[in-house]
Amino acid sequence: MGTSSKEIPVTFAPAATLNDLIKRMAKKKSAGILLYRLRESGLEVFLVHPGGPFWTKKDDGAWSIPKGEFEEGEDPLNAAKQEFQEETGFSVDGNFVALNSLKQPGGKLIYAWAIKGDCAAESIKSNLFSMEWPPHSGKREEFPEVDRAGWFTLEVAKKKILKGQVGLLEELLNARKRAG
């Protein structure tokens, strides 16, 4: 499952349709899994770094939980599990804890579930996507959707994760406190 290719269309809207684009973005939803583990040093979370040429030199503020968009009528938790497997090559199952959803700066809503588990971050196998590269060259190249993964303490994760997802780390702490 780690070698499938997914075509991701990139289109630019004329200024006249900017309001339509904003409305569509506000309706977009993602579902993801926040995998965590306990070590002697404390709580660690599993994050992924997006692949492709735009993210190559970005590190702090570029990482994410494994997640992806899902369609209306699709079960968000099943979508989150599928995205986790597509982006990492690992399956995850067990007692999922729903976290409060977060609205991203661009309007996208993220539904996330936390689960305790472990995996070898250095062994991920991500699916691929295709895009024109270099821009306006007429050539298409394939890139991994995720180019690397890692385990981070919460302190480091807050620096690595996308700004709009920091709240998920706080939600994880709150969920663990509620669980006792």
Name the predicted role of every residue range:
Residues R24-S64, W113:
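N-terminal strand-loop-strand
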Residues E40-G42, G52-W55, E71, G106-G107, ...:
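Short, charged/polar surface micro-motifs in flexible loops or helix N-caps
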Residues S64-L99, T153:
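The catalytic Nudix box helix
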Residues L154-G180:
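Charged phosphate-binding loop/patch that engages nucleotide di/tri-phosphates or the phosphate backbone
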